[in-house]
């Protein structure tokens, strides 16, 4: 549909997927790709059976086992009876409804938001949904991707559509280039630190600027992955040659002339020069330093060369009270140097930072410590995001770099990102984690989570505390 009014990328994606927009009703959008897993799909399948409905387009749905599985064993019951029941249910449901499943031990199994891109299931210009809040990851490709609830999972199963109200638009521009050693995780944590944990509520965010354009696809995924952590419905990055090169040749991606024509279309998938956004935020890349969260939401973050803030540093009474609560839960004292905070657990993994580039970066830091071992009082685990990532890392010898230094090398899965499997922290454990959420109890009851980059996590494992790698 052509229009004389300049449009944002989000508005273009919305318009091309709009099925119905009846006055007084919630608009209806077409869904191109539906990713499912064992946790948010059982009730949706049960309702389909109750109403005797088929999955309308099973070929547009892909299932994987990721949240509840053990990363120590491929046995379906290794993470407990409850998890095993959900995993068995997924296998039965996929068979009954004709949905392709990457189950335990399958060469394509992995975290949904890792396997989608690496297999070419994630494509620019599409709408992608999943019953998981970090579906925004796929926005790195210029796809409108967002998490949905179980009732919405059922709606997509039955109709391949979804009712959605149109969001507001926000542009976040990161000007210039980041300094040496600054990662994509640092960029997104710095953004969240500036906006606060609810700063983009009600918006779809488009990331742009030289610092964003310079990122690899895997780094862009890290940025978009955490869009929900400051309230955004979704995060978008305009597709470019970096995107096209990444997608080309992937197993499920278009091939030959079909791919070439797709690229022609994808090149137009960007915000028009004069498009108006409802909100604009600008950051200077050179000001971004390595980040560490100190509190109990991702917005409570500071550079590693800083100190734990005091409640008196906040003028807003809500933020002041939040700081008091966070310091109490985290067992921290205001004024403590971030580099003086010691950890006893390290987790490198999750849909935020478990791809091959993340593992290479972490291994590179381990090598810089020239034979030093993980501190004896620390348990450190490396969890690749998929079997393909695992195999690639092993072919490069990364697993040996980690295990020789005292890290555990695990099987793919969501693992310690969330307390939903057998990788759970105990009360009082303090973890340097490459995941995306540091809420109270997120990694286990009473657990204390500090969100960091893979590089920072690896350094913390070797030294026992947070390190300013650029000092």
UniProtKB/Swiss-Prot annotation:
It catalyses: (2R,3S)-3-isopropylmalate = (2S)-2-isopropylmalate. This is 3-isopropylmalate dehydratase large subunit. Binds 1 [4Fe-4S] cluster per subunit. Pfam families: Aconitase. One of its GO terms (biological process) is L-leucine biosynthetic process. HAMAP family: LeuC_type1. It comes from the Bacteria. Its cofactor is [4Fe-4S] cluster. Pathway: Amino-acid biosynthesis; L-leucine biosynthesis; L-leucine from 3-methyl-2-oxobutanoate: step 2/4. The gene is leuC. GO terms for molecular function: 3-isopropylmalate dehydratase activity; 4 iron, 4 sulfur cluster binding; metal ion binding. It is an enzyme of class 4 (lyase). PROSITE patterns: ACONITASE_1, ACONITASE_2. The lineage of its organism: Bacteria, Pseudomonadati, Pseudomonadota, Gammaproteobacteria, Alteromonadales. Keywords: 4Fe-4S, Amino-acid biosynthesis, Branched-chain amino acid biosynthesis, Iron, Iron-sulfur, Leucine biosynthesis, Lyase, Metal-binding. Belongs to the aconitase/IPM isomerase family. LeuC type 1 subfamily. Its EC number is 4.2.1.33. Catalyzes the isomerization between 2-isopropylmalate and 3-isopropylmalate, via the formation of 2-isopropylmaleate. [4Fe-4S] cluster binds at residues 351, 414, 417. Signal peptide: none annotated. Heterodimer of LeuC and LeuD.
């Amino acid at each position: 549909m052509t229009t004389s009014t300049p449009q944002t990328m989000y508005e273009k994606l919305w318009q091309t997927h709009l099925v119905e927009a009846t006055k007084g009703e919630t608009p209806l959008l077409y869904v191109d790709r539906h990713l499912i897993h064992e946790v948010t799909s059982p009730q949706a399948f049960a309702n389909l059976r109750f109403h005797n409905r088929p999955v309308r387009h099973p070929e547009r749905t892909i299932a994987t086992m990721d949240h509840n599985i053990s990363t120590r064993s491929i046995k379906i019951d290794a993470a407990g009876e409850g998890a095993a029941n959900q995993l068995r249910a997924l296998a039965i449901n996929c068979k009954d409804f004709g949905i392709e499943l990457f189950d335990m031990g399958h060469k394509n199994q992995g975290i949904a938001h890792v396997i989608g891109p690496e297999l070419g299931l994630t494509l620019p210009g599409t709408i992608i949904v999943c019953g998981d809040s970090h579906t925004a990851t796929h926005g790195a490709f210029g796809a409108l991707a967002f998490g949905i609830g179980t009732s919405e999972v059922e709606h997509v199963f039955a109709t391949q559509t979804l009712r959605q109200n149109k969001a507001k638009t926000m542009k976040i521009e990161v000007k210039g280039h980041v300094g040496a050693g600054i990662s994509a995780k640092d960029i997104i944590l710095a953004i969240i630190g500036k906006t606060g944990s609810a700063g983009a509520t009600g918006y779809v965010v488009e990331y742009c600027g030289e610092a964003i354009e310079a990122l690899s696809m895997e780094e862009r995924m890290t940025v978009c992955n955490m869009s929900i952590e400051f309230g955004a419905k979704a995060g978008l990055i305009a597709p470019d040659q970096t995107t096209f090169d990444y997608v080309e040749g992937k197993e499920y991606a278009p091939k030959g002339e079909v791919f070439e024509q797709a690229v022609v279309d994808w090149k137009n998938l960007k915000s028009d020069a004069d498009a108006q956004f409802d909100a604009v935020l600008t950051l200077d890349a050179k000001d971004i330093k390595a980040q560490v969260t100190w509190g109990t939401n991702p917005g409570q973050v500071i550079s590693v060369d800083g100190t734990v803030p005091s409640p008196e540093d906040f003028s807003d009474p809500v933020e002041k009270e939040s700081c008091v609560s966070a310091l109490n839960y985290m067992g921290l004292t205001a004024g403590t140097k971030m580099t003086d905070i010691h950890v006893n657990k390290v987790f490198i993994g999750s849909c935020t930072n478990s791809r091959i580039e993340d593992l290479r970066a972490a291994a590179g830091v381990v090598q810089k410590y020239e034979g030093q071992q993980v501190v004896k009082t620390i348990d450190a685990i490396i969890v690749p995001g998929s079997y393909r990532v695992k195999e690639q890392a092993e072919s490069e010898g990364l697993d040996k770099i980690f295990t020789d230094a005292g890290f555990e090398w695990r099987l793919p899965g969501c693992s310690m990102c969330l307390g939903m499997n057998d990788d759970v922290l105990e009360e009082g454990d303090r973890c340097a984690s490459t995941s995306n959420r540091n809420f109270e109890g997120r990694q286990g009851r009473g657990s204390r989570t500090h969100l960091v980059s893979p590089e920072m996590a690896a350094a913390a494992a070797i030294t026992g505390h947070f390190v300013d790698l650029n000092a």
